[in-house]
A protein has these predicted regions:
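DNA major-groove recognition helix of helix-turn-helix/homeodomain DNA-binding modules
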Residues: 55-73
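Residues in the recognition helix of alpha-helical DNA-binding motifs
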Residues: 20, 34, 45-48, 74
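Short, charged recognition helix plus adjacent turn
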Residues: 72-104
Length: 104
């Protein structure tokens, strides 16, 4: 049921931001300075090692005009995909479904 018959693979929103910076010729260091975050934080986000928060998405929207809601929604879809690939999470959910099925 989690597949729903299609194979859409969510992209970390950092990839979109990274591509936009490259197309505009803006360095990560410069963007970090402009929006007021550390270079390390920005680099981690752009490389998918850190999630995009709502606050960060708003900063990026102000700086680049990339829609903040789009970035946050992308992050949510990405997080869901990661959770669905986690065998421990899925085993816990399956166990929970079995328990709840006996209660209802």
């Amino acid at each position: 049921m989690s597949n729903l018959g299609y194979s859409f693979v969510p992209v970390h929103p950092g990839e979109i931001i990274k591509e936009e910076l490259q197309s505009r010729g803006i360095s990560q260091k410069r963007l970090a300075e402009v929006v007021g975050v550390s270079y390390t934080m920005l680099n981690d986000i752009l490389n998918g090692r850190r999630p995009v928060s709502t606050d960060f998405a708003l900063l990026i929207e102000a700086a680049t005009d990339i829609n903040a809601e789009l970035l946050v929604n992308m992050q949510t879809r990405y997080n869901m995909q990661i959770a669905r690939k986690d065998k421990n999470v899925m085993a816990h959910l399956e166990n929970l479904r079995k328990i709840c099925a006996t209660l209802l």
